Every structure is written in structure tokens, then in C-alpha cells.
């Protein structure tokens, strides 16, 4: 994987999880 992809995923995944779980 590209470092850029990992950085984006590291930022997007927690945000999506936060939005779904409603535990921001």
C-alpha cells in the first residue's frame, strides 16, 4: 500500500466509526 493511502484510511476509518457508533 502507498503511505498516502494508509494516512487517508487512518483518518477516514475513525471518522466513519465515530459517525456510525455516535460516540464522538
From Swiss-Prot:
The keyword Secreted applies. The keyword Secreted applies. InterPro entries: Antimicrobial_frog_1 (IPR012520). Has antibacterial activity against E.coli and S.aureus strains. Has antifungal activity against C.albicans. Has hemolytic activity against rabbit erythrocytes. Disulfide bonds join 18-24. This is Brevinin-1JDb. Keywords: Amphibian defense peptide, Antibiotic, Antimicrobial, Cytolysis, Disulfide bond, Fungicide, Hemolysis, Secreted. GO terms for cellular component: extracellular region. Coiled coil: none annotated. It comes from Odorrana jingdongensis (Jingdong frog). GO terms for biological process: defense response to bacterium; defense response to fungus; killing of cells of another organism. Pfam families: Antimicrobial_1. Belongs to the frog skin active peptide (FSAP) family. Brevinin subfamily. It is found in: Secreted. Expressed by the skin glands.
